Amino acid sequence: MVIIVIDDGVDWGGRYALRNIRINKIKKCALSESSVGDVMTTTQAATQEELVAHLFRRAGFGATPSEMESVKGMDYEEVVDKLMDFSSPDVFPTDFISRFHKDQSDLRLAEAAGAHWVYRMVMTDTPLREKMCLFWHRIFATAGTKLIQHRVIVNQINMFRERGVGKLDDLLVGLSQDPAMIMWLDNQDNHGSNINENYGREILELFAMGVGNYTEDDIKDTARAFTGWTVVNPEYMSIKMRNNTVRPYGYISWQYEYDAEDHDQGPKTILGETGNWDGEDAVRIICDQKATAEYIARHLYHFFVADEVPVPQWPHQGPRDETAIKLMVDSYFNNGHSIKSMLETMFKSDFFKDESTRYARIKSPAEMVVGTMRLAGPIKLPSDETYYAQSVCANMGQGLLRPPSVEGWQGGSEWINTGAYVERINFASRILNDSDKEGVKDLLTRIKNSSGDGTLTSDWLVEACLAVLGPIEVAKTTRDRLKIYASKYGN
């Protein structure tokens, strides 16, 4: 049976969902999450198992049956702590991959860099770390299209892995010193004698505070604070990067440099504080603002809890759950601007566990693609599957390392249109049609073994698939249609 992964519910796939079912020979079984255009009808309190499945969908890319079994018997809070344990680094066979895929030796090209990240997301043992990389990539949107090589964006993602759940101040300093961001927003052209406002504007408007919480003078003086934050010899290094190949040069890139002689040493007033500020001072002042905490909290809610209105509407429309935002803001200030503390507060909160949020957001293309691949089982090398996966993400509107603009992706209902919906169905069908994959074998075995007395019916088949894929709940109309289709075409 095929149930197509969409978002945090299951959208009725009609004949697409059951087209290849045979009750006596189950052909496919694919996870989906969506309730687009369909109202969930469940009213009972969530069970422990349902809450844990919900947590895995949000804090990761969903859970395989084996992952669910690995936390059986643990309290919900213990599962949260387990998912938030980032002490062990992921280990990947990068040497083997780069030998088979020459373009992954230096990751210059978009396709290779995107495939590299897909592999890490699928194979990671710490999915929340990769999920946070997606989160920051969505906010601090930086595209390789302007940057000669996509490896510089890969390096930025690595910085998110190191700082993405730490102190916001440290993350923003790392972002401000990141060569990809410097060149993306032209801070190499931001001089003490002639400022360029691009980065000063975006760190306030898009990255940290949001529209309406600063003035034009704040933008100018923030830009002045970041004068001298540049890269070493940008023109020369750009030429070398364009001439760079896998052999004989290896990987050449920009390196951050602070040029004290190019820094504006005059007094600056940023958000009401005056002094001879530099970039680190500007970050400290920004991170001390309540508006910053509220902005980051709302992004976290939008990404992990429930779809909000698009970000450009935030100045005109309040948050979906003001109490939730306040809880995360309090956690931010009570724990030294810690993003990890905000995440822990969110995942352990009543608002996160509430049934009204369990099926209240649409998966991004990357979440859907990676979740499906993790369900199907580990990637066996060598494989071109990750190249296909990154191209599917792009076809559905989320080219990894290639956001459409500095505003990133808005998400929510914008992920779903006719073309993207078909892409999701086709991708899930292709990946889960391979019965040689370990995860697919496991799913089929579990579904077959769940029949108990051996009686095979359409009702049993639908319920067995929903149970083994989560468990996940669907709208009554979805369940009824799936059962009708299974009854008609399942034998």
Predicted regions located by residue number:
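Extracellular beta-strand-rich recognition modules
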Residues: V2-I6
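Acidic/polar hotspots within intrinsically disordered regions
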Residues: D7-D8, Y16, D38
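Active-site substrate-binding loop specific to GH73 endo-beta-N-acetylglucosaminidase modules
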Residues: I26-C29, V36-G37, A110-W117, Q149-I379
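Flexible, low-complexity segments enriched for small/polar residues
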Residues: T42-Q48, V52-P65, Q289, A293-N335, ...
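N-terminal accessory alpha/beta regions
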Residues: P65-R163
